[in-house]
């Protein structure tokens, strides 16, 4: 090989190693595609951030004149608004701390052997919850309902309600006092115009278990309705609350009281002569009382 052939070969190799136009265009396309992908990712990221900021701006109240704000100042406003909401929550919890008090701190239940003025103090047990007047009023009605029944009521109130609610505190206190005694109602007081005899309470209640069961059912339903209304008025969600009330009536053997009894026809005539009434009116009056007593005995 001569020197001329060697030079031609070297020149051909140099030209073959030089980049062509097609190669340069392909490289440009690759660089442009990488840049476009990067810009699309960045654009999606920025759009998500802007959407989140816009949702925050919609939640937090702002002035209409303050439409243009930088993100740092807006984030500071978000933090301040969160602190404001926390203060509100703390104020609400402080005002309702009485639901968390233990039942032992309540006023003890008074005995029913006192005067009527002492009986009026019963609603104070629930009135200690001073922030909820509706519950206090409804609990006073519950006590009036209990006092309308003469025999002892062994109440077992089983509730499934949220913790720290006002009714849970009252029901737990009632469970700690199972042997509550109530005032004898005026309906059971004797009528002096027909004479009186002393008898025990077990003479009023018959041995028929159906009668006592029906009376217990009526009283339980009445207390349950009142308790449900009290819960609704106090704001308790009844769809998440399950309440059951069961009252059991029992006879009493430790106390006597007077019950109106029959008077003889001669006694009726003497009473009629003293009061200026006819014997027929006196007998009819005694018969009415006897009829009412028979209805009670049933």
From Swiss-Prot:
GO terms for cellular component: nucleus. PROSITE patterns: BHLH. Residues 17-27 have a biased composition (Polar residues). Keywords: DNA-binding, Nucleus, Transcription, Transcription regulation. One of its GO terms (molecular function) is protein dimerization activity. GO terms for biological process: DNA-templated transcription; regulation of DNA-templated transcription. It comes from the Eukaryota. CDD domains: bHLH_AtBIM_like (cd11453). It is found in: Nucleus. The keyword ATP-binding does not apply. InterPro entries: bHLH_dom, BIM1/2/3, HLH_DNA-bd_sf. Its main location: nucleus. The keyword Transcription applies. Residues 37-46, 288-298 have a biased composition (Basic and acidic residues). It holds the Pfam family HLH. Positive brassinosteroid-signaling protein. PANTHER family: BES1-INTERACTING MYC-LIKE PROTEIN, TRANSCRIPTION FACTOR BIM3. This is Transcription factor BIM3.
């Amino acid at each position: 090989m001569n020197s001329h052939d060697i030079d031609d070969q070297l020149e051909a190799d140099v030209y073959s190693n030089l980049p062509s136009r097609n190669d340069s265009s392909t490289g440009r396309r690759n660089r442009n595609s990488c840049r476009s992908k990067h810009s699309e990712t960045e654009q999606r990221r920025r759009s998500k951030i802007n959407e989140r900021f816009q949702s925050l701006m919609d939640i937090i109240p702002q002035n209409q004149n303050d439409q243009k704000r930088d993100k740092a100042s807006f984030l500071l406003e978000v933090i301040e608004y969160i602190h404001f909401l926390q203060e509100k929550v703390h104020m609400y919890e402080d005002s309702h701390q009485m639901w968390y008090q233990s039942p032992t701190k309540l006023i003890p239940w008074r005995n029913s052997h006192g005067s009527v003025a002492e009986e009026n103090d019963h609603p104070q047990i629930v009135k200690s919850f001073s922030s909820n007047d509706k519950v206090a009023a409804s609990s006073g009605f519950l006590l009036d309902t209990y006092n309308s029944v003469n025999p002892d009521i062994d109440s077992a109130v089983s509730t499934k309600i949220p913790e720290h609610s006002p009714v849970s505190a009252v029901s737990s206190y009632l469970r700690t006092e199972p042997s509550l005694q109530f005032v004898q109602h005026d309906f059971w007081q004797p009528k002096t115009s027909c004479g009186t005899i002393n008898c025990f309470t077990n003479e009023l209640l018959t041995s028929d278990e159906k009668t006592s069961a029906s009376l217990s059912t009526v009283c339980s339903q009445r207390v349950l309705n009142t308790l449900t209304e009290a819960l609704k008025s106090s704001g308790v969600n009844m769809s998440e609350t399950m309440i059951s009330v069961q009252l059991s009536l029992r006879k009493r053997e430790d106390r006597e009281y007077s019950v109106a009894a029959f008077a003889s026809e001669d006694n009726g005539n003497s009473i009629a002569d003293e009061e200026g009434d006819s014997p027929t009116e006196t007998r009819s009056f005694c018969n009415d009382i006897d009829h009412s007593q028979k209805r009670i005995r049933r």
